[in-house]
Amino acid sequence: MKWSEISIHTTEEAVEAVSHILHEAGASGVAIEDPAELTKEREQQYGEIYALNPDEYPAEGVLIKAYFPQTDSLHETIAGVKSSIDVLPSYDIEIGTGNITVNEVNEEDWATAWKKYYHPVQISDTFTIVPTWEEYTPSSPEEKIIELDPGMAFGTGTHPTTTMCIRALEKTVQPGNTIIDVGTGSGVLSIAAAKLGASSVQAYDLDPVAVESAEMNVRLNKTDDIVSVGQNSLLEGIEGPVDLIVANLLAEIILLFPEDAARVVKSGGLFITSGIIAAKEKVISEALEKAGFTIEEVLRMEDWVAIIARNA
């Protein structure tokens, strides 16, 4: 089978939104070439367990590559993707050039090329994220491994927002806690919470592909006795109370449910949010405070923030 590689040149701010647009358009896989990976702070702190080739990354901006089977409707699909991306500035998301290029790739190249972007990464004092196809031996008994197979559909679990969420969970999760993960994606945050001692984790995503991916990764990490995965829109119809909610979503989506989060998380419980570009920190903090939360801590990495807030 022939595949088309759709490359979109954009900004780091727009990565999650553009990736979501591509998934919704039916991409069978997405790879992200971000030059920030070459100089990330965590390389000094923890050390990525591989060497990156600068020649494979754009000089500026971010290149997002998505893979679609070649069909008669591909041109319409690309036009729809472009239209959706062009709308993002109306949500204050800078898209950069937004240039789109198309290349043909063979199935055998498509099936393996994306794996070069994904290697074991130690993202905190506790966790190392390891792809299923690589062998890795923990450096200490305390080191916890999260195995992920993104299935060509979701990220590697090493984006700054995911890293900060996991570090926030390390700071806050207590043995026996009950947790909800909103917009679970690959399920990485739910798996981390389970490995930190949570007794029950409910993981939700609106995207059925995400639900399938999360279920697979939860089983892979042998946390399916703790983590349940389901399809749901944010916190609609979800009852509490739970000890903690974690949501790694775009700021614009987080703004849709602070009141629901305050309803579902118990009094004194925590709401961890990320996916927030630094410029949106103030508006998110104000929305959380309006819903009754107190901001306890803000984590920062590159141009992103994560917020730990406590319910009244």
UniProtKB/Swiss-Prot annotation:
GO cellular component, one term: cytoplasm
Annotated GO biological process: methylation
Catalysis: reaction(s): L-lysyl-[protein] + 3 S-adenosyl-L-methionine = N(6),N(6),N(6)-trimethyl-L-lysyl-[protein] + 3 S-adenosyl-L-homocysteine + 3 H(+)
Superkingdom to which the source organism belongs: Bacteria
Transmembrane residue ranges: none
CDD domains in the cross-refs: AdoMet_MTases
Protein family: Belongs to the methyltransferase superfamily. PrmA family.
Protein name per its UniProtKB record: Ribosomal protein L11 methyltransferase
Organism (species): Bacillus cereus (strain AH187)
Upper taxonomic lineage: Bacteria, Bacillati, Bacillota, Bacilli, Bacillales
Gene: prmA
